[in-house]
Structure formats: structure tokens, C-alpha cells
A protein has these predicted regions:
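Core subunits and conserved enzymes of cellular information-processing
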Residues: 2-5, 11-215
Length: 215
């Protein structure tokens, strides 16, 4: 069944009629705060040489394997996912996702000018960065938005089959981390795996169907 008119992932069908919807100002606040938290987490991962997950992680691996520019790969990989989002999740979800991607790109571009780390241990970066990213994604998900890519598929599977979005994303990230063993230092891979677990367990614990029914 099309999801264009459905609530956020975790929708409980039939319980949404009397649920107060998020206002536009609340959605804007959520997009800004969610992407800023993710940008902070990404900064910690980047500073310590850790890997990211999802389509960004896949684009990263393909870049090292083929030499093709990361930006081109990331754009091409995301195209089918945005098509899926438009067809299955609706234009509102797709528009918010485009906005979230643009904001994250802006924050990560400006961030080095206002944020630096003198000392940051990779383990702390993995845990704190994972929590920041997980919380940011949670905010976006609850306002019918994502950062595209595999996250869209994870949300769709949660709607259609009841699979937790966090666990689906965790499985994807674990596969990417395993593939990265061929191009990245094993120690960094281990820390990256910790970050992936923290990020996705944050979603799995806090984004359960039926617990959150606001829209």
C-alpha cells in the first residue's frame, strides 16, 4: 500500500486520526537540529579517520576502489532511493529529505571554520559521534525525513514488514564495514564498527513502532 499519506515510521495504523501533527515551524526546527547533530557526529568521525555508514560509506568505498569522485558516486547511488521515496513515502517525505541533505552538506562545509579538535580519541569519537548521529536521525525520522539512501529502504521495510529501521541500517553498515577491511586500517574499522553499533542501537531502542505516534 502506498505510504504517501502515512505517518512517520512506526505508524500504528488507525491511531493517527486524533494525533496532533507537527507544525511547519516544528519541522523546520527538527531539520535544522537533526542535521546539525549529525554534522557534529560526522566531524568526530572524520577527525579520527572513522568510516561512515549508508550510501556515504558505499560511495567512500567505491571512490577508493575506482578513483571516481566521491560526489559523483554519492549522487548516482542516491538516485534510485529518491525515486523510491517519491513513489512510496510521498512528496512531503522526499522534499524534507532533500532539504535535510542540503542542510547537512552546508553544515559540514562550514563546520571546519568554527570547530576544531585538539585531542580526540577514536573510541570516544565512535561512541559520542554515534550517539549524536543516532539522535539526529531519530529527530529526522520522527518528522518524516531522512538523509536518503539505505535509510529510505529501512523506513519502508519498517512500515511494510515491521522490521526496526535501526536494525536494518545496522545490517547494511556492518556489511560496508566488512568490505572496508580491504582499504582501511583494521583498527579504524574496529572503532567504526563501535560507532555504527551505537548509532543504530540508538535508533533501534528509541524508534519502535507504536511508541511514537505524533506526525
Amino acid at each position: 500500500m502506498p505510504l504517501a499519506g502515512a505517518g512517520p515510521p512506526g505508524d500504528t495504523r488507525g491511531m493517527n486520526d486524533n494525533v496532533e501533527r507537527h507544525s511547519r515551524s516544528e519541522d523546520v526546527q527538527a531539520l535544522l537540529s537533526g542535521t546539525l547533530l549529525i554534522a557534529l557526529g560526522v566531524a568526530m568521525f572524520t577527525h579520527t579517520g572513522l568510516l561512515t555508514g549508508g550510501t556515504a560509506g558505499l560511495a567512500f568505498l567505491l571512490h577508493y576502489a575506482t578513483g571516481i569522485a566521491f560526489g559523483k558516486l554519492f549522487f548516482l547511488i542516491n538516485l534510485p532511493f529518491y525515486w523510491i521515496a517519491w513513489r512510496r513515502m510521498g512528496r512531503v517525505f522526499t522534499f524534507k529529505t532533500f532539504a535535510a541533505v542540503a542542510l547537512l552538506s552546508l553544515f559540514t562545509e562550514l563546520q571546519p571554520h568554527v570547530l576544531t579538535f585538539d585531542a580526540l580519541h577514536p573510541l570516544y569519537a565512535a561512541v559520542a559521534g554515534g550517539l549524536l548521529c543516532g539522535t539526529g536521525f531519530l529527530i529526522l525520522f520522527r518528522h518524516q525525513a531522512s538523509l536518503g539512501g539505505f535509510g529510505i529502504v529501512a523506513l519502508m521495510l519498517q512500515q511494510d514488514r515491521g522490521w526496526r529501521a535501526g536494525k536494518v541500517q545496522l545490517g547494511v553498515d556492518c556489511v560496508l564495514v566488512a568490505a572496508a577491511l580491504f582499504v582501511v586500517d583494521p583498527e579504524r574499522i574496529a572503532y567504526s564498527l563501535v560507532g555504527a553499533v551505537v548509532l543504530n542501537m540508538t535508533l533501534a531502542v528509541n524508534h519502535r513502532p507504536g511508541r511514537y505516534i505524533a506526525m
